[in-house]
Amino acid sequence: MAAPRTYLAIDLKSFYASVECVDRHLDPLTTNLVVADASRTEKTICLAVSPSLKAYKIPGRARLFEAVQRVKEVNAQRLQTAIRQKKAVRGEDGRYHFASTSFDASALNADPALGLSYIVAPPRMQRYLDVSTQIYKTYLKYVSPADIYPYSIDEVFIDVTGYLPYYHMSAHELAMTMVREVLYNTGITATAGIGTNLYLAKLAMDIVAKHIPADKDGVRIAELDEQSYRYLLWNHRPLTDFWMTGPGTVKRLEAHGIYTMGDLARFSIHGEDRLYEIFGVDAEILIDHAWGYEPCGIEQIKSYKPSTNSISEGQVLSTPYPYDKAKLIVREMAEILMFRLTEKKLVTESITLEIGYDRENVDKGGYRGLTQTDRYGRTIPKAAHGTIRFDAPTNLGSTLINESAKLFERITDPALTVRRITLNANKVTPDEGFYQVDFFTDTKKLEREKKLQQAMLGIKNKYGKNAVLKASSYEEGATMRQRNAQIGGHSAGGSAGGSDGKLQK
């Protein structure tokens, strides 16, 4: 039997929002701030919400309009308090309003008559990457890169098994030491989970730590092993709180009377075959997790190589796009895929395109086709999708762009406006430099195109992605220039120093 291991999961608290607060010399734990690109629309997603603003039941990934609406509701209640305390001001129109507002939770708690305000900070993805790298280097002072798995920009797993005897520390002490140094260096608080496997470390951080008191710096550290997991979490609801258990899985479990991990564990004793009928090979993961088991460690994660790979480009458009403008976006996205494949020296066997239509097509009343429900429960036209396979793997722009445009024409309803586009390059493999040719193939032309792509890529890497652009990228509705200035679909922004933000009242 393998020797027991000890893992840490560390999550930086409201990371993007905390960076924005620290760069403004504000306290991340008491400052009301959201990170969102208000220049788009109020439908834009809030990339982060500060802890003090979350306390007003604003979720971390709310749409901006949802945050705005919730603050209005809170202020309506606070204004009544101000009126009762005779601290409100009456305007010329006879209406009451706040004499003062604050975005600091301490001030708001001390004076219930203050109006709640908050800062809307535009995202600065490059700054967040820089701070994340700085924090990663802090972890490296204590452990080897081989024992760290960065799960996301603000979350890591660490195998600390061999380091506990070396430092003469418990897992809790080592976690606190690293978290304290991160706080000292960056001003950012973290939450940590300790577990006998990766799954339990993650749950200790995600679920258990949320229900224990924080220290004076907002730090929470929780621990789980198989036995304490069963005692503490077998009756926990909802199941969606558990790592890797999404709404679709939960819906199927509940259809069979399974509402908790304890229910699932007990069901698996005699109903294992039924679980495999429902979930296929994924049943093994569900059963293991129900009992608190996870055989996979960091070494296995790092050594894993998927049997197939793909590269994806996707975007949600800021406004509904008509057919012709949406087609322009597809061509731009195919060009971006071409450069990504060229840079990685990869080719693709096929492309898949998915077109998501806007809700206005249904709201206007003329649409009579198939529909589906979006994440907000609204009815929208059923998305269109299709795939084109190439005669031979390729990364040539002429093929990718033209075939993507043809696929768009084939699957998209010209009468509907488009809101979401996803383009995938499927089954990507290393470029061996071969072509499938016949008597009509101009191999010299193909070589010239490939060399031109590589030259353009070199210019972009040296002078910026917008150094070389097609004329079509300057047409109305084109998004490539803006997206080239983004990281992960959001503004790269500046580096150190707080960027401009808007104070909302």
Summary of predicted features, one role per range:
Residues 1-288, 295-298, 443-505:
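Gly/Gly-Pro- and Ser/Thr-rich, intrinsically disordered tail segments characteristic of DNA damage-repair
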Residues 2, 9, 241, 247-417:
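DNA-contacting surface of Y-family translesion DNA polymerases
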Residues 189-191, 352, 420-422:
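Residues at or immediately flanking beta-strands
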Residues 162, 196, 357, 392, ...:
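Non-catalytic surface loops within mature trypsin-like serine protease
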Residues 405-461:
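C-terminal hydrophobic structural anchor segments
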Residues 153-156, 347-362, 424-432:
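Core structural elements
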Residues 156-162, 384-391, 435-441:
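Short, hydrophobic beta-strand segments
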Residues 363-367, 433-437, 481:
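Short conserved micro-motifs at the rims of enzyme active sites and ligand-binding pockets
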